[in-house]
């Protein structure tokens, strides 16, 4: 499944894409894949929206985190160490930009100005924390001076100042002719013009020199203005302090810094909209806990983690946000842990399949390979892969392993899937044999799956013992019956499964669902004994 078989390497990466319509056995198959990965010493992180992995997570004594209003999933994606800042800040910054724009813009793409400003605030925010600003260097002041002068020449402020100075000079000259009281306002060069002892040639030369020096004097005076402006910018930067890293402190920093940038760069940015939209996640807001609480550090040591976020899947703001910060947790885990890592995103991936997220998804997929990690996306709707360019460009194109379950429901529309996944005619022929061959005799119940690794694709049967079936099941009554056994036995999940399966077989009941219904009806653990 990972693209390798012994020493044979079929793929360039282990990222995978799974397509299986409802009823095709997708959940059972994915549980089987996760079991195999875990038993091969892989750290597993799953984002789910339907309790499909609750049983196997309990079996492996993993961590099952289910979102609720009483116990929401909360993290602090803004918190990083100095080492992370020095070594991986570029990647972290891109993630935080995606996060901020997910909050601010939703599915809308940010403008160039918005991207530039948010990028600058994030950069300066971390500089203020790790390397607090004191003053501009001589080189920085010189560059700022040139930039600000050029900016004012571009926007007409310099021309306006120059015109005002020239008008002021002309006004003084006119007043000189009509009133001797203004003679004191004229500079040394103008005094030459007033000197009755001066010859006409000297007066003419003085007037010519005055006219020649005026632009230089104007620019020199204007540069003094710019120096004062830089002094103010320096004071503003120095006053921007960050004491701790969190969304709260970033929000405060951004709301102080962005208005300064708007004035300095003469740009437009919807600062009031920005402040209002992000405010619910700030201190005292309805969602203040989401981005300001430190993540339980023990999660980085857990080998099997399931985030169950079904309760928030209909929230257009929280759903993509939570998926995004879980992906960031995996990214951190990916760097910290040395062994193989796997992130599986079930239907929740649709929350982030937006233009704003496209670059981050591509980055995650490409980075996974460098850190012995893989990302898998699981879906059941054909439209999910045929109607979204984000899926094709960011997910499919960066996945070398495709897994398709029974596609008979999609037979009339399969040409679109074939084109999107670049399947061959031979692949398609194999796919439409899934669960259709006469190969069931002498085997326990199973379903089939087509797995393509690189250019090589084949159909495989998914056969598991009844103990695994009970760990994987998503049938509500079977899950409830198993939980009942666990409570009554006071045992761990494995013992409960072993006892349940033993009783099921010894009961003579063929189907696990029928036995589960019997357990729930009679409310007891049967403890059947094997007859000698």
Task: Write out the residue ranges for each language-model feature.
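P-loop NTPase motor domains
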Residues: 1, 7, 54-63, 69-71, ...
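Sequence-level motif detector for i,i+2 pairs with an aromatic at +2
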Residues: 13, 301-304, 446, 457
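Residues in well-ordered beta-strands of folded domains
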Residues: 1-2, 19, 76, 308, ...
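P-loop NTPase motor core of the ASCE superfamily
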Residues: 86-139, 389-532
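Conserved P-loop NTPase motor cores
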Residues: 3-36, 41-53, 61-72, 310-430, ...
């Amino acid at each position: 499944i990972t693209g390798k078989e012994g020493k044979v390497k079929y793929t360039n990466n282990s990222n995978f894409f799974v397509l299986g319509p409802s009823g095709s056995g997708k959940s059972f198959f994915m549980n089987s894949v996760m079991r195999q990965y875990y038993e091969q010493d892989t750290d597993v992180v799953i984002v789910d929206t339907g309790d499909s992995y609750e049983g196997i997570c309990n079996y492996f004594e993993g961590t099952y985190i289910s979102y609720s209003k009483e116990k929401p999933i909360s993290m602090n994606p803004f918190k990083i160490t100095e080492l992370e800042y020095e070594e991986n800040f570029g990647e972290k910054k891109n993630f935080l930009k995606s996060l901020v724009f997910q909050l601010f813009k939703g599915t809308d793409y940010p403008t160039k100005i918005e991207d530039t400003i948010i990028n600058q605030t994030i950069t300066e925010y971390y500089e203020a924390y790790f390397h607090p600003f004191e003053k501009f260097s001589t080189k920085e002041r010189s560059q700022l001076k040139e930039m600000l002068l050029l900016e004012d020449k571009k926007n007409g402020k310099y021309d306006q100042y120059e015109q005002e100075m020239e008008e002021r000079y002309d006004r003084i000259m006119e007043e000189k002719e009509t009133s001797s009281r203004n003679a004191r306002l004229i500079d040394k060069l103008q005094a030459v013009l007033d000197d009755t002892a001066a010859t006409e040639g000297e007066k003419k030369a003085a007037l010519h020199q005055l006219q020649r020096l005026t632009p230089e004097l104007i620019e020199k005076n204007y540069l003094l203005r710019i120096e004062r402006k830089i002094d103010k910018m320096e004071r503003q930067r120095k006053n921007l302090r960050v004491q701790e890293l969190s969304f709260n402190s970033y929000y405060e920093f951004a709301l102080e810094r962005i208005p300064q940038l708007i004035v300095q760069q003469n740009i437009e940015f919807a600062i009031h909209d920005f402040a209002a939209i992000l405010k619910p996640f700030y201190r005292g807001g309805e969602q203040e806990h989401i981005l300001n609480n430190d993540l339980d550090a023990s999660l980085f040591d857990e080998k099997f983690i399931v985030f169950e976020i079904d309760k928030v899947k209909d929230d257009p703001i929280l759903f993509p946000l939570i998926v995004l910060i879980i992906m960031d947790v995996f990214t951190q885990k990916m760097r910290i842990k040395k062994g193989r890592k796997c992130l599986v995103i079930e239907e929740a991936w649709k929350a982030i399949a937006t233009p704003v997220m496209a670059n981050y998804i591509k980055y995650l997929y490409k980075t996974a390979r460098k850190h012995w990690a893989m990302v898998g996306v699981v879906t059941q709707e054909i439209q999910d892969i045929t109607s979204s360019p984000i899926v094709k460009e960011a997910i499919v194109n960066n996945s070398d392993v495709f897994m398709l379950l029974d596609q008979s429901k999609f037979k009339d529309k399969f040409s679109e899937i074939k084109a999107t996944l670049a399947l061959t005619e031979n692949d398609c022929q194999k796919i439409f044999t899934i669960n259709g061959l006469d190969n069931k005799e002498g085997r326990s119940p199973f379903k089939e799956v087509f797995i393509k690794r690189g250019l090589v694709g084949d159909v495989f049967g998914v056969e598991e013992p009844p103990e695994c079936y009970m760990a994987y099941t998503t049938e509500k009554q079977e899950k409830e019956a198993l939980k009942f056994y666990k409570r009554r036995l006071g045992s761990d999940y494995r013992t409960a499964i072993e006892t349940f399966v033993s009783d099921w077989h010894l009961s003579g009941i063929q189907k696990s669902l029928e036995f589960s219904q019997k357990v729930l009806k009679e409310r007891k653990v049967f403890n059947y004994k094997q007859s000698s």
